[in-house]
């Protein structure tokens, strides 16, 4: 018998009945109340979180029917919403709206007390909810922070109507109920009391507790708290605004006849300046005008429109009505989140007592930062050439950028170097700036490689540029003369190590330019050498002593002339020549017949040849050599080890 009774109890357990589990899934327990347990559940169709209040059927719960009837008649945005009622043999399940913000008591305990601005907003919503109840003759009789919930937006939801009752106008109540610290003084009289007045007193206690964090009437015993309530004495040692103290003093008036009504509270100075409008009731069109959109959604779920309209009209609070109310609540919350606030609602913020002018500061946003850094590298002659501008853009900083002095001589020239990957070296030659109005753009997508395919055709290019000139002066060049040595294959390869293809071609042209300059110099210089005084010995400080005969001169890449080449053109006289023992050097009219004569004998003075014939001869040589070099680039020949004639130089006579 006992075993059967245990099984029957398990089967009739609230969370084992099919009437509940067919529509909801139990998630957790929210707490235990004075009349039953509250569970957190999820609606299976809409996935809406709800609170289920489990009330067992017994003779002790005489107010159960009254609470359900009162909850059915309430429909206000600041009152917890009744969604579904499930009646079984053992229990009654009341499905309510779930307030995710929790209790107001928890919020006050977490912060100690609430700011006056927030107290104003929350208290206004409490007054609106209580005014709605009093207009319908409903007395709550248990207003306290534990029964005031907050939703996800922080708005008030008045709950727990277990002690509430419905009265008619002028009816007196005699039942002593409520929570002691929030009870009004007239509750302790047995002559009866006004239900609306005790709710206003409880509102005053809640407002005091929100603004100060302390209860106005405290004591260690029941009699001590009762005496303080009857006397109406409370502490005022808190920094509150005078208007707020005025509201508290009027609400906590001991005489209930002098206590204001709920509709008069909104006319106080602390509240009347606010223009907040209470949201419209969520159930304003529940009975006669259902939302067509929600009807279509429920039709997709399998509900018939006639069934939906009947459930809403008769207010059955069954599964059909619960689904409709949940879908409507979701639709209303989404619409309110999209709407922009009205300008009048901005008055809820804290009013500043000081000056309204604020210092404006400029906010630096991350999006305002440039994606590519721009560097401006000016040259020395930039102040003279206003039209010239040199700009470099990098996604990665370059290692080295070299600009030549002569590149800024031409007005209007613009040199732009763009990189996507950091280059290793960028150099510009002196001869780059000879042509006016020329614009050079060098672009690198990858760093220059150490090895280049140009190595394979170096011998052919060297032959085309250095040995293949059609000029007559090319036959006069002697490889044994160290001052006329342009470069060997080794120096040729060193010239190609750095720079781009354009710079490499410029290196060839520079070498040819130096060669013809030396030839023109020999044509326009004459030296008178007396017979018998020709000194065939080499001066002791000649170039051959400083540099061995077999050593070859290196050609600088990217432009600048080496100091050693400058010394070759104008070296100092020997000591014997300065003492008169050497030859007297003058201008000569012809080139020496023997190419083996040492050039140290003619290093006294140099005369610059005329420009017109010099340029004609240079460009003639450049044109022929450049065309032959371009033809040689079309084929890639294997590397051939060719000995340059300059390496077979004959040492000068001593």
Curated annotation (Swiss-Prot):
| Catalyses which reaction(s) | L-seryl-[protein] + ATP = O-phospho-L-seryl-[protein] + ADP + H(+); L-threonyl-[protein] + ATP = O-phospho-L-threonyl-[protein] + ADP + H(+)
The EC number(s) given in the record are 2.7.11.1
UBA domain mapped to chain residues? 289-329
SMART domains of this UniProt entry?
A: S_TKc (SM00220)
Gene Ontology biological process terms in this record: cellular response to glucose starvation
InterPro entries for the chain: Kinase-like_dom_sf, Prot_kinase_dom, Protein_kinase_ATP_BS, Ser/Thr_kinase_AS
**A GO MF term:** protein serine/threonine kinase activity
Keyword Transferase among record annotations: yes
Task: Write out the catalytic residues in the record.
Answer: 142
SUPFAM superfamilies given in the database record: Protein kinase-like (PK-like)
Q: Where does ATP bind?
A: 30-38, 53
Keyword Transferase set for record: yes
Key words, A-Z: ATP-binding, Kinase, Nucleotide-binding, Serine/threonine-protein kinase, Transferase
Question: Which residue ranges are recorded for the region named Disordered?
Answer: 336-369, 563-616
| PROSITE patterns in UniProt | PROTEIN_KINASE_ATP (PS00107), PROTEIN_KINASE_DOM (PS50011), PROTEIN_KINASE_ST (PS00108)
Q: Where is the composition biased (Polar residues)?
A: 342-369
Which PANTHER family does this chain map to?
MAP/MICROTUBULE AFFINITY-REGULATING KINASE, RIKEN CDNA 1810024B03 GENE
Q: What does this protein do?
A: May play a role in sperm motility, especially in the regulation of flagellar function.
User: Hey, which family's this protein in?
Assistant: Belongs to the protein kinase superfamily. CAMK Ser/Thr protein kinase family. Smok subfamily.
User: What's this protein's name?
Assistant: Sperm motility kinase
Encoding gene, per UniProt annotation: Smok
